Amino acid sequence: PVYPPEHVAVIGAGIAGAATAYALASRGVRVTVLEAGAAAQAGSGNRQGLLYAKISAHDTEQTELLLGGYGHSRRLLDKLLPERENWQPCGLLHLNHNAAETRRNTQLAAQTRHAHLYRGVTAAEASVIAGIDILSDGLYWPQGAWLHPAALVRALLAHPAITLCEHQPLLS
């Protein structure tokens, strides 16, 4: 039989490290998170992040993995940040900002397999959704969300089986 570890160390207290620690702690493993600086710095320290599944226009295993992760992320946000002051599922407009994005978004809008997640919109439709003038077409993700990444990191690291050790640089 394979026995799970009793205690592990995770290096880094950004979103990836905090999520890894939380997943392990949720399965009964004690976790020590070692962070060279403070938790939720670098990209995880941004004031705001966007949540949507940046999937391929083609049906691939990676697309299915991303969609599964997207659904899991939404459920986890509901569980960890129920008050909605640090995230909001308010929808997201992904505008066509160059030729490559226009091609990609047009291909996505044409396929119907994931139509429950997004739909193509004209500039006029995007303007109505946003409440301001929008000059380009794009995709609308009604289930898209904004979030405060540092709040998510703090919520993940608050698990009772996680010990956070900040300002602990590792030497090679």
State each model region's role.
Residues R30, L117-R119, T163:
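Conserved beta-strand segments of alpha/beta enzyme cores
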Residues A21, A25:
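Gly/Ala-rich phosphate-binding loop of Rossmann-like dinucleotide-binding domains
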Residues Y3-A16, T32:
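Beta1/beta-strand and adjacent pyrophosphate-binding region of the FAD-binding site
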Residues L139-S172:
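Helical element adjacent to the flavin cofactor pocket in flavoenzyme catalytic cores
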Residues E35, T122-A123, E166-Q168:
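Short loop/edge segments at beta-strand edges and connector loops
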Residues G49-I129:
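Dinucleotide-binding Rossmann-like beta1-alpha1 core, especially the glycine-rich loop
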Residues S26-G45:
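Glycine-rich FAD pyrophosphate-binding loop
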